[in-house]
Amino acid sequence: MANIKSQKKRILTNEKARLRNNAVKSELRTAIRAVNTAVESADKDAAATALVSASRKLDKAVSKGVLHKNNAANRKSAISKKVNAL
């Protein structure tokens, strides 16, 4: 346990950030899973709408500092390839 006052405050702040980041990451996983299931079922329309939603959530995660921009770009590229292959 921290003895320094500022470190005690940082522990609280870090815990809030961790919970917020986990929520964002969970939404991302759900969105990407939706794209993958639409691709597996060969539903072009559903895959396209899920791709737009997932891309948006990836961009938001970057702006919130949850993901690095290159990581998001790689993920968007991977799911786009799957959708375009339909």
From Swiss-Prot:
> What keywords appear on the UniProt entry?
Ribonucleoprotein, Ribosomal protein, RNA-binding, rRNA-binding
Give an example GO biological process: translation
RNA-binding: present as a keyword of the record?
Answer: yes
Task: Provide an example Pfam family for this protein.
Answer: Ribosomal_S20p
Q: Which InterPro entries match?
A: Ribosomal_bS20, Ribosomal_bS20_sf
Domain of life, per the record?
Bacteria
Q: Which Gene3D superfamilies match?
A: Ribosomal protein S20
Write down any Gene Ontology CC term.
small ribosomal subunit
GO terms for MF: small ribosomal subunit rRNA binding; structural constituent of ribosome
Q: What is the stated purpose of this protein?
A: Binds directly to 16S ribosomal RNA.
Family the entry assigns: Belongs to the bacterial ribosomal protein bS20 family.
User: Which PANTHER family does the UniProt record give?
Assistant: 30S RIBOSOMAL PROTEIN S20 (PTHR33398), SMALL RIBOSOMAL SUBUNIT PROTEIN BS20C (PTHR33398:SF1)
* This protein's name: Small ribosomal subunit protein bS20
Per the UniProt record, the source organism is: Pseudarthrobacter chlorophenolicus (strain ATCC 700700 / DSM 12829 / CIP 107037 / JCM 12360 / KCTC 9906 / NCIMB 13794 / A6) (Arthrobacter chlorophenolicus)
Instruction: From the UniProt record, report the name of the gene that encodes this protein.
Output: rpsT
